[in-house]
UniProtKB/Swiss-Prot annotation:
Annotated Alphavirus-like MT domain residues: 72-290
Cellular component terms per the entry's GO annotation: host cell endoplasmic reticulum membrane; membrane
UniProt-annotated stretches for the region ATP-dependent helicase: 712-975
EC number annotated for this UniProt entry: 3.6.4.-, 2.1.1.-
Full protein name: Replication protein 1a
Region (Disordered): 538-561
GO biological process, one term: mRNA modification
Source organism (scientific name): Cucumber mosaic virus (strain FNY) (CMV)
Length: 993
């Protein structure tokens, strides 16, 4: 830090505050401080608080989060317990800021009991576990559905293609894996140990959470959290207002005591002067966050750290560590600042003076009352007179007084039910003290022994007194009754933490792994940022791109340790092969495990989504019935999935089923599976073909193949299908394709039929091979292999017992991509043993070659090697590409001789609707209108690419999708588009050609 070259004290002394140098210094300092504040506001995240907050509430939230966020208190609407709601939003953002926010799957964050709609609307990379534990939870879910629908309708383009990521299962039952988690006021129903067990089930390492906190809960039966305007009270059960009067000792050591209590002790949180629903939670769960420190469970040890306690909210974090933990003494304290000015006084609780209870009274009030009571005590007076004196003083010290016309509270008002007993207890305490002092005085002067004792020197008196007290302990004076109790301002807990299970945790290796993984992920993020920056600079209008609708994760050399170990442990054979010294066998086994886990997660997600919809509509796991709010619920879900529907027991559907769609399974109280016409069940888009669970089971039952995998990586139209046709041998080969359309095309090319027995025997999809009986072959010919997961390809080879796989595909076209954004995909890319390239196309016309080269230059990162930079065409067609702008779908020239391609399902649906309006045959809009993804591998003479919207669509920026769209034709290609789309790769290249 730089220092000034002059002395400030001398400067002020010589020139005063009017001096030129002093003024300049003050101006400079003020300018620097103002600049720092402006920079903070620019950097800080803007957080809008809509709740109306008072002056004190505003100061509370600004003191807590004003330094971290740029808070905007808009004062828009009154809300129940507004400060608590505002703090909850800031707490959520604060806890999320503790973890990486890259958006990558490996940085997914779990939220136990949080609001899924908050994360959905803000675009957080979060999966919420939001169980329906009662009517309150269902009400919250219904309200979130309404809020989601309202916001989506106002800005549908922002949420196009996105779906909320949450489940309605308890946290311990959800199977989504993630390293990080948050719990914003979600631990009340789980307790410290319940949170640890949920973390273990999810493979979570670090959890950060918040909860309402008052240390006085360890002592009192009721209290107030003043900042939150919240009153808490212990009740015997959720349905009884009987107070828990357990003594303090029992409360601090209630592990054994709680086992013999008939009812659980609950804590009710009520917000003062607000007629809203309160919260009732188990005291044992709340207490665990105050008393517990560590918990060992299934090879992991979890420890809690209490980070910040502010405004009645405690922020804590739970960290899990694997392996052995040597014994260590863990010590922590809970402080009771609210009772530091109080003293405990025992008062009668029964007329026979057998039962007593302890009440709190201000130390100053008791001290002054007792002082006057001692000075005014006279054993000659009747006890009633002295009792009145004490009551008068006690009343004066705890009532409202008027001084110079101003009313003031003197002391603290005493409960009317305890007022008389407090005065009576002080009277008994005063009388007992006088009697004790009198006895002591009489004993001192009663005999010659006392006089002899008094004549001794002080050392002899001390020695003699110690000997007598040691030999005759019963001679010690002792009090028959103790009235005053000193209230401790803190409680200390000592716990010995140790765990002997598991192996020693290799922290050094873990650090190296995390560093390597972070570098790889950081490079991916840096490349994405650079690409977005380049797009932004290239466009006249600034536009920030969302993540692509479908993306292929970059494989890493090392699997995710947390997720992999959990899956590998379920299958010994593949687990053993992942540790094989033969590298390719280990890679294939790991890929098969990943593919099986991926298909299983797809199935679980489908079940979870359907169960969530079923529960939202009022269904449960016991009865086959739904409630009356069906239209509201299904209208909301229909905005994100047009295939959502209800089949009633009468046989009718709530919405018309799209033509050609047949649902193979449905969901009701009996779960997901085939349903009859007389059943009530619900469906969504995943119920048309639902074979993920079967694919996962079959894959796990196989072993990694040891045969050779060869890949022919050729450009579009290089003759891959022709090559398959020329080398196919029926006696030894089987042809496998990625999808049904490709299988039909290959069957027509080889057998001139798409449904003959011979064609269906030798040409099958990968799913068909895994799910059905099939003969063993020695060689597999795979078409469009890039659309397969590497684990699925290995499973097909293993199922067919093939010793060789010859795979054809284009690595730069659309590759396999995960349909579940929450799954950490790392082994999807094909790893061949042999690779050969083909850079000559026989399909694409001459003018397509420079267009694709230009697209590769613009879209691919610098330094990327692409075979399309040197590809050549043998086509005789020299000019084929044209484009034209259209105003709407009605101007699209629908011709049965052309093949129509769209980037999105929405544009495809619009074209199909237009074809139906024009009464075109069903075969036309079933076979001649496809999306780019569905068109991969297709070859047509005349192709038209249609874009009907000018709203943001990242698919037009991706090289792989644009490449497929531009290389399907042999003779002509026409691009028809509505409006100008920023970043449209095809339009830019066609315009420059």
């Amino acid at each position: 830090m730089a220092t000034s070259s002059f002395n400030i004290n001398e400067l002020v002394a010589s020139h005063g505050d009017k001096g030129l140098l002093a003024t300049a210094l003050v101006d400079k300092t003020a300018h620097e401080q103002l600049e720092e504040q402006l920079q903070h506001q620019r950097r800080g995240r803007k957080v809008y608080i809509r709740n109306v907050l008072g002056v004190k509430d505003s100061e509370v939230i600004r003191n807590r989060y004003g330094g971290k966020y740029d808070l905007h208190l808009t004062q828009q609407e009154f809300a129940p317990h507004g400060l608590a709601g505002a703090l909850r939003l800031c707490e959520t953002l604060d806890c999320l800021d503790s973890f990486p926010s890259s958006g990558l799957r490996q940085d997914l964050v779990l939220d136990f009991g949080g609001s899924w709609v908050t994360h959905y609307l803000r675009g957080h990379n979060v999966h919420c576990c939001s169980p329906c534990l009662g009517i309150r939870d269902k009400m919250r879910h219904a309200e979130r559905l309404m809020n989601m629908r309202k916001i989506i309708l106002n800005d549908p383009q922002q949420f196009d293609g996105r779906q909320p990521d949450f489940c309605t299962q308890p946290a311990a039952d959800c199977k989504v894996q993630a390293h990080f988690a948050i719990s914003i006021h979600g631990g009340y129903d789980m307790g410290f140990r319940g949170l640890c067990e949920a973390m273990n089930a999810h493979g979570t390492t670090i959890l950060k959470g918040t909860m309402m906190f008052d240390g006085a809960m360890m002592f009192d039966d009721q209290g107030v959290i003043p900042e939150l305007n919240c009153q808490w009270r212990k009740i015997r059960s959720a349905f009884s207002e009987t107070e828990d009067v357990t003594p303090l000792v029992g409360k601090l050591n209630s592990t054994v005591f709680s086992r013999v209590r008939k009812f659980k002790t609950m804590v009710a949180f009520d917000f003062i002067n607000e007629s809203t629903m309160s919260y009732v939670h188990d005291w044992e769960n709340i207490k665990s966050f105050l008393t517990d420190q560590t918990y060992s469970y299934r090879g992991m040890t979890y420890g809690i750290e209490r980070c910040v306690i502010h405004a009645g909210i405690m922020t804590y974090k739970i960290i899990g560590v694997p392996g052995m933990c040597p014994p260590e003494l863990i010590r922590h304290c809970i402080w009771f600042p609210s009772i530091k000015d109080y003293v405990g006084l025992k008062i009668p609780a029964s007329q026979d003076l057998v039962e007593w209870k302890t009440v709190r009274i201000l130390t100053s009030t008791l001290r002054e009352t007792e002082e006057i009571a001692m000075r005014c005590y006279n054993d000659k007076k009747a006890w009633m007179e002295q009792f009145k004196v004490i009551l008068g003083v006690l009343s004066a010290k705890s009532s409202t007084i008027v001084i110079n016309g101003m009313s003031m509270q003197s002391g603290e008002r005493i409960d009317i039910n305890d007022y008389h007993y407090i005065g009576f207890a002080i009277l008994l305490h005063t009388k007992m003290k006088y009697e004790q002092l009198g006895k002591m005085y009489d004993m001192w002067n009663a005999s010659s022994i006392s006089k002899w004792f008094a004549a001794l020197t002080r050392p002899l008196r001390v020695f003699f007194s110690s000997v007598v007290h040691a030999l005759f302990p019963t001679l010690r004076p002792r009090e028959e009754k103790e009235f005053l109790i000193k209230l401790s301002t803190f409680v200390t807990f000592n716990e010995e933490c140790s765990f002997d299970g598991g192996e020693e945790w290799d922290v050094i290796s873990s650090a190296a792994y995390v560093a390597t993984q972070a570098v790889t992920d950081g490079k991916i993020l840096a490349a994405q940022k650079a690409e977005k920056l380049a797009e932004k600079l290239a466009q006249p209008v600034s536009e920030v791109s969302d993540s692509p609708e479908t993306s292929s994760q970059t494989p890493d050399d090392t699997a995710d340790v947390c997720g992999r170990e959990r899956e590998v442990s379920e299958l010994d054979s593949l687990s053993a092969q992942t540790r094989s010294p033969i590298t390719r066998v280990a890679e294939r086994a790991t890929a098969m495990l990943e593919y099986a886990a991926y298909e299983k997660q797809l199935h679980d997600t489908t079940v979870s989504n359907l169960k969530r919809i079923w529960n939202m509509a009022g269904g449960d796991d016991k009865r086959n019935s739904l409630e009356g709010n069906l239209k509201f619920v299904f209208d909301t879900y229909f905005t994100v999935d047009p295939m959502v529907n209800i089949h009633f027991s009468t046989g009718r559907w709530m919405r018309p089923v799209p033509e050609g769609i047949v649902y193979s399974v449905g969901y009701n109280e009996r779960g997901l599976g085939p349903k009859s016409d007389g059943e009530l069940y619900i469906v969504n888009s995943e119920c048309v073909i639902c074979n993920s669970e079967s694919l996962s089971t079959v894959t796990r039952s196989l072993q990694a193949p040891t045969g050779t995998i060869s890949q022919v990586d050729g450009v579009a139209g290089c003759g891959k299908t022709t090559a398959i046709k020329s080398i196919f041998e029926p006696s030894t080969d089987m042809i496998v394709t990625a999808n049904k359309k490709s299988a039909q095309d290959v069957r027509m090319a080889l057998f001139k039929s798409s449904d003959s027995k011979e064609a269906c025997t030798f040409v099958r999809t990968a799913d068909s091979v895994l799910l059905n009986e099939c003969p063993t072959v020695s060689r597999v010919l795979v078409d469009e292999v890039v659309l397969l997961h590497f684990g699925q390809l290995c499973a097909v080879m293993s199922k067919l017992k093939a010793v060789r796989a010859i795979c054809f595909g284009d690595s730069e076209q659309i590759a396999f991509s995960s349909r579940d954004a929450s799954f950490d995909m790392r082994f999807s890319k094909i790893i061949p043993d042999e690779t050969s390239d083909a850079d000559t196309t026989f399909r694409s016309p001459q003018d397509v070659v420079p267009l694709v080269r230009l697209m590769a230059t613009k879209a691919l990162p610098k330094g990327t090697h692409s075979k399309y930079t040197k590809w050549v065409s043998q086509s005789k067609v020299k000019r084929s590409v044209t484009s034209r702008a259209i105003a709407s779908v009605t101007l699209v020239d629908l011709d049965s001789s052309r093949f129509y391609i769209t980037m999105t399902q929405a544009d495809k649906a619009s074209l199909i609707s237009r074809a139906k309006e024009m009464n075109l045959p069903k075969t036309f809009w079933n076979e001649r209108i496809k999306t780019v993804h569905e068109s991969q591998g297709i070859s047509e003479d005349h192709v038209t690419l249609v874009r009907l919207k000018s709203t943001k669509c990242d698919l037009f920026k991706q090289f792989s999708y644009c490449l497929v769209a531009l290389t399907r034709h042999k003779v002509t290609f026409r691009y028809e588009y509505c409006g100008v789309l920023n970043g449209d790769l095809i339009a830019e290249c066609v315009a420059r050609a």
